[in-house]
Amino acid sequence: MFTMKKSLLFLFFLGTISLSFCEGERSADEDDEGEMTEEEKRSIRDKGKTIAIDLAKSAGTGVLKTLMCKLDKSC
């Protein structure tokens, strides 16, 4: 009876260890997915910034051309 309890306790111990390893791997996989979304968000923000800067530059050059035209009275 005592040896049977020992073996059952040993099997329970091994099962608990393997379960904790599985949970650790699962949480590591979930963390990787979160990092991908953060990287994607960062890349979208960077693209948005470059588009906004390009639009501001083109609008600024348009305004400057109009001002130069009105100052020179060549319009």
From Swiss-Prot:
Q: Mind telling me which residues form the propeptide?
A: 25-40
Domain of life the protein comes from: Eukaryota
The Gene Ontology CC terms held by the record are: extracellular region
Q: Which GO terms describe its biological process?
A: antimicrobial humoral immune response mediated by antimicrobial peptide; defense response to fungus; defense response to Gram-negative bacterium; defense response to Gram-positive bacterium; killing of cells of another organism
Recorded hits in InterPro entries, A to Z, give:
Antimicrobial_frog_2, Frog_antimicrobial_propeptide
Alphabetized Pfam families for the sequence: Antimicrobial_2, FSAP_sig_propep
| Localization | Secreted
| Function noted in UniProt | Has antimicrobial activity against Gram-positive bacteria S.aureus ATCC 2592 (MIC=10.0 uM), S.aureus ATCC 43300 (MIC=10.0 uM) and B.subtilis (MIC=30.0 uM), against Gram-negative bacteria E.coli ML-35P (MIC=10.0 uM), P.aeruginosa PA01 (MIC=2.5 uM) and P.aeruginosa ATCC 27853 (MIC=2.5 uM) and against fungus C.albicans ATCC 2002 (MIC=10.0 uM).
Q: What is the residue range of the signal peptide feature?
A: 1-24
Q: In which tissues is it expressed?
A: Expressed by the skin glands.
Q: What is this protein called?
A: Rugosin-LK2
Q: Which keywords describe this protein according to UniProt?
A: Amphibian defense peptide, Antibiotic, Antimicrobial, Cleavage on pair of basic residues, Fungicide, Secreted, Signal
Q: Give a yes or no for keyword Zinc in this entry.
A: no
- Which family, according to the similarity comment? Belongs to the frog skin active peptide (FSAP) family. Brevinin subfamily.
